[in-house]
UniProtKB/Swiss-Prot annotation:
This is Truncated FRIGIDA-like protein 1. Disulfide bonds: none annotated. Pfam families: Frigida. GO terms for biological process: cell differentiation; flower development. Truncated inactive FRIGIDA-like 1 protein. The gene is FRL1. It comes from Arabidopsis thaliana.
């Protein structure tokens, strides 16, 4: 499937997903007596919000088609190349992995990987896809990522800019979750020790909670911590885009997700609550 087909399919599924959200909202309304009296969000407001997003996405997609040579998906492999492996049809859609990045992953060099990512980091150009492709070259991605987090106190100064290395930690663990990396017993035990250490630093700092929950999610440590406490941390990080991902991965059950939604609603954060409704 080409990139344009993937986008079109996702847009076509919006109505179906909105129906599921409507059912979740109706279930919530059935327990309205448990909600804060100040809760006044209506389905029409939610529907209007997502309809606006849908319209904007569809409009931009049509504009993309009108300005780019996608009609024939020219970036696909030509039929004349049919003699190549069938898997080559998708190769042009894969991100290019820089040789240095690939070499670091092949050598399982976590510290070198952190330094490299900090050096090339650009807020305007997300690295998720390239790192996801590169990390698959590592014989042991989970151990490499853990090495990077455990051993990094690196902050570049030659450029004169400060950088929060925790952003790289989160990126690496996001990718680890995405590729469903194998976690050995030794790596898991090391990660458990690090997670307890990081948990002690959380306090009321949402980004520390975000890193902690990624440790729990990426290294499959959900059973090592109290679920109620994990749910409280999810509330702390609800504003971050990764919140629902880690919530699902760490095993917060449906009952506690319901309580989380109620807490968000009572706190005047209905849009954040919607994220957890389906």
């Amino acid at each position: 499937m080409t990139a344009s087909e993937t986008i079109a399919t996702a847009i076509n599924q919006i109505d179906e997903k909105k129906e599921k959200l409507k059912k979740a909202f109706d279930d919530l309304q059935a327990h309205r007596s448990l909600l804060s009296p100040s809760f006044s969000l209506s389905w029409s407001e939610i529907d209007s919000h997502f309809s606006s997003l849908q319209s904007s996405l569809a409009s931009r997609f049509r504009l993309l088609h009108s300005t780019s040579p996608l009609e024939h998906d020219s970036y696909r492999i030509d039929a004349s190349d049919a003699g190549k492996s069938s898997s080559s049809e998708e190769v042009s859609e894969q991100p290019v992995v820089e040789p240095e990045l690939r070499a670091l992953c092949e050598k399982i060099d976590g510290i070198g990987l952190i330094k490299y990512l900090i050096r090339i980091w650009d807020d305007e150009t997300p690295l998720n896809q390239e790192v996801s492709a590169a990390i698959r070259y590592s014989p042991d991605p989970a151990s490499m990522v853990l090495d990077a987090i455990e051993g990094s106190n690196y902050t570049p100064s030659s450029s004169g800019r400060s950088f929060d290395v925790r952003r790289v930690f989160v990126l690496l663990m996001e990718v680890l979750i995405e590729i469903n990396a194998n976690i050995t017993v030794d790596t898991r035990n090391r990660a458990k020790k690090l997670a307890y250490h990081w948990k002690s630093k959380v306090g009321v700092k949402p980004f520390e909670a975000l890193v902690f929950l990624h440790l729990v999610a990426a290294f499959e440590l959900g059973s090592e911590f109290d679920t109620e406490e994990l749910s409280d941390y999810v509330f702390m990080i609800a504003k971050y885009k990764q919140a629902t991902l880690v919530c699902n991965k760490i095993g917060v059950d449906r009952k506690r997700v319901g309580k989380l939604i109620k807490t968000l609603l009572d706190s005047g954060k209905p849009i954040l609550a919607v994220k957890f409704m389906y």
